[in-house]
């Protein structure tokens, strides 16, 4: 640490050992209990990300693990339909509660928040990113292993 250090690393250009990098990772809702996260991603649409996610969650659930699926496909959500879920997610002052499938898989998708599940969502860029982040920060995932 420099002799002139005032302890304010955000305005300092020195690379001292006291500097701790700021995490850019959004923290989940404090009431959530989440084990590990498996991301199923691709830059291309229509390659089976939702199908793989649904099958992976089902396989986890069948082996005794508790699973949840965060459907980040805001403009074309299909996870609720894959699981046959049509009821809306619920919310209170503490957060949003995901819908639960017949087999106990917790799911969160934008169409679980719409009045009509097939209403189009015409969002772009930062608004989509904000919605996905809210699914992580505002949803209360109840003791999921994956």
Where do the protein language model's features map onto the residues?
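N-terminal, positively charged regions that mediate nucleic acid binding
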Residues: 2, 12, 51, 63, ...
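Conserved, well-folded catalytic cores of nucleic-acid-processing
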Residues: 15, 63, 82-86, 134-142
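Solvent-exposed alpha-helices and their adjacent loops that cap or buttress functional pockets
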Residues: 30-33, 89, 97-102, 139-142
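Walker A/P-loop phosphate-binding motif and the immediately C-terminal alpha-helix
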Residues: 36-74
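Alpha-helical scaffold segments in soluble metabolic enzymes
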Residues: 55, 59, 78-81, 130-135
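Phosphate-binding loop that captures ATP/GTP phosphates
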Residues: 66-67, 72-118, 122-123, 129
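Phosphate/Mg2+-binding loops and adjacent switch elements
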Residues: 121-146
